[in-house]
Each structure stands twice: as C-alpha cells, then as structure tokens.
C-alpha cells in the first residue's frame, strides 16, 4: 500500500537536501513535512513508538538467550528491575525458573509501556483539542510516553546500546556483514549476469545491483557470497 500516508509514515528521517529533492519530484508530497517541520499522522507516530517498545523487548530476550547480556546486568536498569521484582513478588516460584521469570518481566514491562502511551497520548490529544488530521500534524508530537516512562525507557535504550548493540561480538558480525554486501556489490557490477535476468537487464546497473542486494534475505546473501567468492565469512 504505497498511499501518501504509508510512505510518509515509513520516512522517519529526512535531511533538508533530500526533502527538497522529494519536493521537486512530488510537490506537496512526503518531503513537504520535513520542510514545514510538521508531524506525521497519528498512526505513523504510534507505529514509531510501538516499534521502539517491541524492539526493546525483543532485544532483551534475544540478548539474554544469546548470552551477550545477563539478567544480573539488566537488574541495574530501573525499568527492568521494577517489573522483575514485581513478577517475583506475584509468582515466587519464578525465582527458580529464570526463563519464565524473564518472559513475565518482559510481558509486564510491555503492558505498562503500552498503557502509558495510551493514557499520555489521550491526554495530549484532548489538551491541544486536535479534531482532524491537519490539526494533529500542527500540534507537535502527540503520541508519546509520560515523562517518567520516557526517562526509564531511555535508560533501558542506553543500556542496550552500550551492552548489546556495541558488544564486541555484535560489532564483529556487523563488520563481516558489511564486507559481504560490499563484495557482492562489486561482483555483480563486474558480472551482471550473476543476478536475476530482470535486474541484470536494468538500464542503471549500479542501481539495479543495489536493489537486487536490498531484496535478499540474510541466508540468501550468505549463500550468494560463498558461491561467488568461494569464501564463507559467517
């Protein structure tokens, strides 16, 4: 669904130069908001925040399961510690079931964050009296956490950046992934026939190569890289 609202919602960030370029190609289109400094639709604002909530929860679970972070480390983060203690008070038996305790902690954390967004957003919409889409766009950010939840969620995000996203093992894997993409690009530019026929026939070769790689799954990219270079990096 490439309606205006969908495209606008997907475009979270846009430099002034890119916005001006978009405005030239589509006057009054998705670039206009970044030039006028107005807000996206309430649906787009909600999706942005829902994404952040879901990603944090998923990354906590993924990080603990992978061994990159521990529950002991997470207990230094006020938001996680609060719901972990709450879960153990409600279900003392979880003290001996760390995996279930983690799931219950995440469940409670998600529930309260969602409730906080609903309550805070409702109050903001009522306060500014936004009655239609245009008024909502001009009112500033309306979908948000309360100040308290924003601070606690921000602390969690900083923790994840420092201990998970910047973990040496993650950084090493990221570097190898970048190398794979770079080498795939070089091979396809030199040998377009290695791509699917519809991409190889494109008039702008470098753009076609970029689009072809962008459409790959991780697994397919790894297989293609090994096939074309004879090396397995990951």
Stretches with model-predicted labels:
Residues 1-234:
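Histidine-centered, transition-metal-coordinating active-site segments
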């Amino acid at each position: 669904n490439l309606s205006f609202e969908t495209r606008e919602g997907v475009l979270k960030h846009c430099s002034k130069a890119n916005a001006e370029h978009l405005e030239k190609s589509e006057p009054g289109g998705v670039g206009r908001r970044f030039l006028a400094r107005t807000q996206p639709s309430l649906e787009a604002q909600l999706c942005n925040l829902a994404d952040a909530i879901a990603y944090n929860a998923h990354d906590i679970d993924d990080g603990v399961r992978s061994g990159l972070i521990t529950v002991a480390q997470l207990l230094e983060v006020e938001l996680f510690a609060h719901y972990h203690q709450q879960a153990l008070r409600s279900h003392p038996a979880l003290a001996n079931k760390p995996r279930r305790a983690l799931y219950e902690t995440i469940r409670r954390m998600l529930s309260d964050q969602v409730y906080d967004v609903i309550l805070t957003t409702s109050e903001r919409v009522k306060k500014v009296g936004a009655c239609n889409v245009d008024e909502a766009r001009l009112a500033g950010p309306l979908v948000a956490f309360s100040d308290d939840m924003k601070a606690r969620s921000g602390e969690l995000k900083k923790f994840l950046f420092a201990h998970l996203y910047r973990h040496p093992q993650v950084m090493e894997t990221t570097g190898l992934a970048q190398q794979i993409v770079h080498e795939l690009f070089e091979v396809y530019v030199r040998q377009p026939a290695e791509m699917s026929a519809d991409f190889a026939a494109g008039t702008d070769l470098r753009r076609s190569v970029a689009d072809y790689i962008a459409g790959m799954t991780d697994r397919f990219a790894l297989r293609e890289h090994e096939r074309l270079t004879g090396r397995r990096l990951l």
